A protein has these predicted regions:
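Conserved core of the PLP fold type I
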Residues: 1-94, 106-107, 114-120, 124, ...
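Hydrophobic residues in beta-strands of the RecA-like P-loop NTPase core, especially within AAA+ ATPase
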Residues: 23, 99-100
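Domain-scale detector for complete catalytic domains at protein termini or as standalone homologs
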Residues: 35, 57, 126, 140, ...
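Conserved Walker B
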Residues: 102-104
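Active-site PLP attachment segment
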Residues: 118-154, 169
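Structural signature of PLP-dependent enzymes
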Residues: 156-162, 180-197
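Conserved glycine-rich beta-strand-loop-beta hairpin in the small C-terminal domain of fold type I
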Residues: 191-197, 208-222
Length: 222
């Protein structure tokens, strides 16, 4: 779809307006606006230092939970593996759906990034949403959604008539860019630059004279 906002609207059409949608508070305001514009009832759930507060989550009326496990906006919180398991257990106990909004996760500073909820899910309760607007360019307006198998037939029946909002040529170019390894190399360069930027901001200028900038900003393919 043409960006994540378009996909948020499809989520409501797919899952229904008769559900309560739980959202992070504070969170990305446009998510609430899109859900509300599509007729969904939103329940704001307070954040702790590791995601949505556990007590608030246990009392929630929501049957759909929209979460941003990595760098939640505006708090910047990244949920732990234990919290991600808690979300999955919550969904399993209520037969609920999790919307994993994984924006910005490509830029994790951990050598071994945390697993996505979608990859941890064994019950088919996670819808994965991401976009290329940060990793490539905002002007591309390309987002994507990965559905669990149990929702695929429902999607085909209720929303399968929609034409894709991203031009076929753009999709083809991006597919080639990914399949030939350029996207991964591009991300590696961005991560190195991000690491250097963080490093330089936290080191005195006198210490930087010993650092090889040529290595950090290498123009090679890796």
């Amino acid at each position: 779809g043409s960006g994540a906002e378009y996909l948020y609207g499809l989520v409501v059409q797919l899952l229904g307006r008769d559900r309560v949608y739980g959202l992070e508070d504070p969170g990305y305001e446009k998510v609430r606006q899109v859900y509300a514009a599509n007729g969904a009832v939103c329940e704001l759930l307070p954040m702790s230092d590791d995601g949505i507060d556990a007590d608030a989550l246990s009392r929630a009326q929501a049957s759909v939970l929209h979460i941003t496990p990595f760098h939640s906006f505006p708090t910047g919180i990244t949920t732990s593996a234990a919290k991600r398991s808690e979300y999955l257990a919550w969904a399993a106990g209520r037969d609920a759906i999790l919307i994993e909004d994984d924006f910005d996760s490509e830029f994790s500073e951990n050598k071994k990034p945390l697993q996505t909820l979608y990859s941890m899910d064994r019950r088919g309760c996670v819808i994965y949403v991401n976009t290329f607007s940060h990793s490539l360019a905002p002007s591309m307006r390309m987002g994507y959604m990965v559905l669990p198998e149990r929702l695929m037939e429902q999607y085909r029946q209720t929303l399968g008539f929609y034409s894709c909002s991203v031009p076929l040529f753009d999709q083809y170019v991006l597919a080639r860019f990914i399949s030939q390894g350029y996207f991964e190399r591009h991300l590696n360069r961005l991560r190195r630059q991000s690491t250097w930027s963080t490093f330089s901001k936290n080191r005195p200028l006198t210490d930087l004279s010993t650092v090889s900038i040529r290595t950090v900003f290498s123009s090679s393919s890796r």
